[in-house]
Amino acid sequence: MTTSFDNPQVSIVLPVFNEIEHLDEELERIRDAMEASQYSFEIIVVDDASTDGSTERLDEIPWIRLIAFRANRGPGAARKIGTEAALGEIVLWSDVDMSYPNDQLPRLVEALDGYDQVVGARTSEEGTHKLARVPAKWFIRRLAEWLSSTKIPDLNSGFRAFRKDVADQFLHLLPNGFSHVTTMTMVFLANGYSVGYVDIDYAQRSGNSKFRFVADTRLYLRQVTRMVMMWNPLRVLTPLATVLFLLGFSKLVFDLIDKDFRVGTNTLLVVLSAGMIFVVALLADLVVQVTRPRHSVLPAAVQERGIGPGNDTTDSADELP
């Protein structure tokens, strides 16, 4: 369908920072793909203070909505502001660096049926620092899967679609850097919203990567742990307390047998530390449960079962998954 600035079904949010070489090609590829689909759409381009002429070129394109930053704020800030400005019920995220299959954006919208978010799971790794990046991403993804108790094929793909009404509840939690995509996945899972995945091809990006391996990997790890601590602190702290308690208890048994019932100070310190961490975990979980906001937006799976707004929930309450 055609571009609509009034009441689009789909809003496509694209962060741009110094992408002048392939900007026109990517935007036209996105427009052609969406015009061939059944969805009315708008394209929101957020220029993150480009210095290569991207801003000036974007200002000449009449069929996009342009948001231009005066200072560089990061891809997370760009996508967050673009999503807040979106008018469509569905928001698509992608890039304009030739890495994602932007001609398949309508496929994401179709796959969203029955889900709150759909992520394009990359089948190959074509990024920079490949030798170090692949094992680092594998470790972070496995950590996220363990913390969230959910299978996650691709944790930090920037090619995704989601319901805007759900995302609006959590946009304030998104960091400004690259870890915002990880946050978007984790925050949906932590709050009971469904995330689906579709396999996509991933190409070597054009131009220079803005990814900083050491700094951004550290931020990914911190953000994954922070997200789970905000909604399930017992998942993080209980194993730590258990390990310390087992170590302390083993040392206690050793002291009682080997030292004529004299318990070492270090043994008591380990056991007490385990107890303190467990108490902190319980208190943190209590705070989370008391302060957890009541969702104003029901998950897609609940709505599909006829328990959405405006429906009688009296006889259906026991059917909630």
Regions found by a protein language model. Name each.
Residues M1-L131, W138, D165-L171, T183-A190, ...:
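Structured catalytic core of nucleotide-sugar glycosyltransferases
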Residues P15, F69-A71, R160, T238, ...:
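Short conserved micro-motifs on helix faces and helix-strand junctions that flank
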Residues P15, I67, T128, K151-I152, ...:
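Residue-level detector of alpha-helix boundaries and kinks
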Residues F17, T51, F162, L240, ...:
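Single, functionally critical "micro-switch" positions that shape active/binding sites
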Residues G74-R79, T83-A86, S99, D103, ...:
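Conserved catalytic loops of nucleotide-sugar-dependent glycosyltransferases that act on lipid-linked
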Residues P233-D315:
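Membrane-embedded multi-pass helical conduit in multi-pass membrane proteins
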